[in-house]
């Protein structure tokens, strides 16, 4: 019995390959990087969104960065990706791993990312803002559920995700899979 494997991730192509390895990446029938805004079949790019953040959004995020009391900053706080951006108070720069555990604890105690997401949703209602990974927010004009259009109603889909609660970046796709195509599995580790 053979199943086709698809990978859906909030990360860009380079980070995805770093995370899963080139062998696994290439074994997937299709990889939906950047929540489906940058799509590859093997080495071939088949789609890339041209969405870009507004100056107003970038200014808002810089204000949030200034407002945060979290003491560790590693740089690269606004990472531009095809079809979206990732925003992180900690940052994605050198030394990111050193502060990651501290930020996770901080965010659990303060709900900082949830609060920033709420303010973003209030100020930019046309955007999709999701808590992604351990330290970031994924911001774009669409979410992971956009990939559902690549599947037929008779396809049986099994979706495994780790951020499947409402407001997290796997939630929209998990909801769409449950409604249309198959089963979801919440992965804890």
What are these regions (language model features)?
Residues 2-4, 125-129, 155, 179-183:
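A generic structural motif
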Residues 11-12, 82, 143, 188-189:
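Short beta->alpha linker loops
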Residues 8, 34, 130-131, 159:
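Short glycine/serine/threonine-biased micro-segments
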Residues 9, 87, 148, 154-189:
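Acidic, Mg2+-coordinating phosphoryl-transfer loop and its flanking beta/alpha structural elements
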Residues 1-77:
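Active-site phosphate-binding/coordination module
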């Amino acid at each position: 019995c053979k199943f086709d494997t698809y990978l859906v991730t909030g990360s860009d192509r380079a980070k995805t390959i770093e995370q899963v390895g080139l062998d696994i990446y290439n074994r997937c029938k299709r990889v939906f990087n950047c929540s489906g805004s940058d799509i590859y079949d093997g080495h071939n790019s088949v789609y890339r969104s041209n969405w870009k953040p507004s100056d107003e959004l970038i200014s808002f995020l810089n204000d949030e960065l200034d407002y945060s009391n979290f003491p560790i900053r590693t740089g690269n706080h606004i990472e531009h990706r095809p079809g979206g951006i990732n925003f992180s108070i900690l940052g994605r720069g050198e030394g990111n791993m050193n502060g990651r555990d501290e930020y996770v604890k901080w965010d659990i105690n303060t709900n900082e990312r949830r609060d920033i997401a709420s303010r973003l949703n209030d100020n930019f209602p046309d955007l999709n803002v999701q808590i992604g990974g351990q330290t970031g927010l994924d911001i774009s004009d669409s979410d992971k559920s956009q990939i559902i259009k690549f599947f037929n109603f008779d396809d049986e889909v099994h979706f495994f995700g780790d951020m499947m609660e409402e407001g997290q970046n796997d939630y929209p796709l998990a909801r769409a899979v449950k409604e249309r195509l198959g089963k979801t599995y919440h992965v804890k580790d």
